[in-house]
A protein has these predicted regions:
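Low-acidity, Ser/Thr- and Arg-rich intrinsically disordered low-complexity segments
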Residues: 2-18
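Nucleotidyltransferase catalytic core that binds NTPs
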Residues: 15-170
Length: 170
């Protein structure tokens, strides 16, 4: 049985590791990160032991309105991981699968908070596998962070609330 989504805690028994470039195991973690939350931070830190290199890709879509500029998001995330040599932060403005291929990614890393997230990520994983041959690795959200989202943080900011508890400390 071959699945397009691999759970970090149990790889399928027939997983074909020969398809993966094992010289440098690279994962990409992508999103708009407007802003980058403690939930995002948790997923990246939990994925770190699985990879030699993680590229955090900040998606930039000209048709989308952001609260923070791509430069501000890049600065925020770079500051958070300044002491982590395995992490790179980059922006991209094309398909995630094209970004993954450019970065020679072994996996696309995604966090899942709910059934709704799972269903969406499952569809995306299937498309990415079909278009680019790259598997998606799902990491389930720590229950402490499952209610945290960038849109929640933006809403709280809009109403002048303190959001520091939802953002990484650096």
């Amino acid at each position: 049985m071959h699945t397009s989504i691999s759970d970090a805690t149990s790889m399928p028994r027939d997983w074909n590791w020969s398809l993966v470039d094992k010289t440098i195991m690279t994962g990409i973690f992508t999103g708009s990160f407007d802003p980058f939350t403690i939930g995002h931070d948790d997923i990246v830190r939990r994925a770190l032991p699985l990879f030699d290199r993680i590229v955090i890709g900040i998606g930039v879509n000209e048709r989308k309105k952001y609260m923070f500029t791509s430069d501000e998001r890049m600065e925020q995330i770079s500051r958070i991981f300044a002491d982590e040599p395995k992490i790179e932060v980059k922006t991209y403005n094309d398909l995630t699968i094209d970004f993954a291929r450019r970065e020679k990614a072994s996996f696309i890393i995604k966090g899942v908070r709910s059934i709704k997230d799972f269903e969406y990520e499952r569809e995306q994983a299937d498309i990415n596998l079909q278009l680019g041959g790259i598997e998606t690795l799902l990491l389930y959200s720590d229950p402490r962070y499952s209610a945290v989202s960038s849109s929640l943080v933006r809403e709280l900011i809009h109403f002048g609330r303190d959001v520091s508890e939802f953002l990484p400390k650096k």
